[in-house]
Every structure is written in structure tokens, then in C-alpha cells.
Amino acid sequence: MAYLIPPSTLENQSSSYLHSPPLRSNITPGDVGILRSTLLPSFALYSSLSLATYIAADATNRVELKDWLWPSAQVLNAWWTAIGQPMTKHGISFGTAYAALPWTKRVLLSCVAIWGTRLFARIAYRSFSRGRDDARYEAVKKEPGFWKGAFLRIFLPEAAVLSVISLSFTVPFTMDTGLSIGDEVVDVVRALAVGVFGAGFALEAMADMQLALHRQERTDLCRHGVWGLVRHPNYLGDTLVHVSFALLNMAGPFNPVVILGPVANYLFLRFLGGDKETEANQEERYKSQDPHKYGQLRQWQVEKNSFWPGLRDLVNPWALAVAGCGFIGVVIEEGFRCTYDM
């Protein structure tokens, strides 16, 4: 999963003067706080992008444009924080700013880019293929005056949530303080993080691909492949990916606040915009439009967990395949590190 990661310096070496405290000589005590150094800049970026997206969504009557923003904005924020800010503050080139990052931070940045780019491409392709707004949003658009309050009720709150979710890949580039672990366990922690990322990325990608292929051939619910593990394997994969971002932080100076990132992402997927919203919409549509599909959904809800697989599902061949993808990711990352980071 690290095939986009270029050469770097050794993990236990200084990341260079560009990311060291001397260059932050003008920072006041208030600047090192997470609110001013990380959360507020992230919220400013996300809220600006959300406003532009809201205007475009209103003009096209497509609420789903906010879903395009979800992964792309996170990638943009990660790269702006890690590379863009040092470039603008110190007048340096892209290559110089990137070379200043230690290996693990390059892995983190690459993982965010790989995950976000694939998800954005998938959402955009699905949107173009469908030719209309996502079914989840058709009902809410019928509410009187929906677009007048949509920015404050939908777009802006998601910008705030994104600001917290992004902590695991913005804090490492904005705050120098943290807890350090021994050099002997750095490689182990990084390998674990890459393995979790590889498994989560593969699970999310497999879920999207299998669902798309299923819909080309049949009209009933997709309950095979990784969809036979849980009812929402794509959201589980996304959760694992964000957990891996926090784990990668532990392979360097670790600020515990980054844990809020995957926690916020999990809570959002479980209780706000993920499986809860999806199934509520499915139940409403299937009950009135497709009784057979509604019956399948009700049966599936009894047989399979929504988010976390049961113990018997852990030995499912597809679960083993996902775990194998995580192992392959570790091998690839280690190969690149041994080749370029020695």
C-alpha cells in the first residue's frame, strides 16, 4: 500500500530544519494549542470548500456533491498541512518540503492520498453513471425551503466533523510535542499500521467493486463476497483506514489527541451519515417500492451484524483475503523502506 512513497530519511533521524522547532520562533504559547494550530485552520479550509460545494449543489440540485468533497477535502488538507504550509512559510520548493518529512510521515501522507483518491474516483464515477442525485437525498430535498437551510444544517456541520476526523493526519505536521516510543518498536508499530490500512483499504475497495458488479447482473441485495461478512463492509473498511492513520502516529512522536480522529469518523459512520442513514433510507424505499428486497433486508439484519463481523465470520475466506491484503501492504511498504530509506 506504499507504492506511491518515494525515498526518505531514516525514521530516527531529524526530519530536517524545515520541520524543527527553530523555524517556529514566532509562535506564541497560544499557537501550539490544538485549537489554533490545527482545528481552526482545518475548519476554515473545510467550511470554505463546503460553501463552494453548497453553491454548486444548489445550482445543480445535487446534494451528493458534498460526498465528492468528503474524501477530496481530506487529501487536500493533509497535503496542504504537510507540504503547502512549509512551502508558503519558508519559500521553499515542493521537493525540499517533502524531503524534510521522515519516513513514517511520508507513509501517512501517501496512505491518505491513496485512500482519498480512490474513494473520490468511486463516488464521482457512481454519480456520473447514475445521472441523478443519490436516493438518500431525494426525500430531504422535498422539504419546504430545503436549500435555504441546507448549508447550516448539512454542509457546515460536516465541515466541523471533518476538522476532528482530520486530526490524525494534521496534528503530526503542526505540533512537535508528543510521546515517543522506543526505536525497537517503531518498525513494529508502523508495520501494524500499514497492515491495518491495507486490510481496510482492500475491504472498502472490494465492497464497492462487488456491489457494482452485482448491480449489473441482479436487482436483489448483494449478500455475497465481503458483503457476507457484515451488512456494511465499506464503512468497516473506512473505519480501519482511519484507525491506521492514528496508529502511524504512534511510530513517531505521538500526540494522544490524534485518537479523536478515528473515533469521530467511527461515530459519524455509525450514528449519523453511515450505516444508520443508509439502512433507514433502504427500509423506507424497499418497503414501499420493492417488498421482496425489503424482506431480504429484514432477514439480512437478523443474520448479519451491521458493522463488526461475528466470530464465525472471521474465518470466512473473504475475511482471510482481506487480512492477506493487509500483509501484502506490509511487505510492499517494508520493501520500499529497505530500498529507499537506508
Predicted regions and their residues:
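Residue-level signal for the start and early helices of compact helical domains
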Residues: A56-A57, F128-G131, K148, A202, ...
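Hydrophobic transmembrane alpha-helices
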Residues: A2-S50, I55, Q74-T117, I165-Q210, ...
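Glycine-/proline-rich flexible loop or hinge segments
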Residues: T53-V63
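A basic- and aromatic-enriched beta-loop-alpha substructure that forms the phosphate/nucleotide-
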Residues: A100-K142
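Juxtamembrane helix-capping/reentrant segments at transmembrane boundaries
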Residues: R62-A78, I92-L101, R132-R153, D220-W227
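Juxtamembrane interfacial secondary-structure elements that flank transmembrane helices
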Residues: E64-L65, P86-H90, T117-A135, G274-T278
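Eukaryotic endomembrane system proteins
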Residues: R130-V189, G198
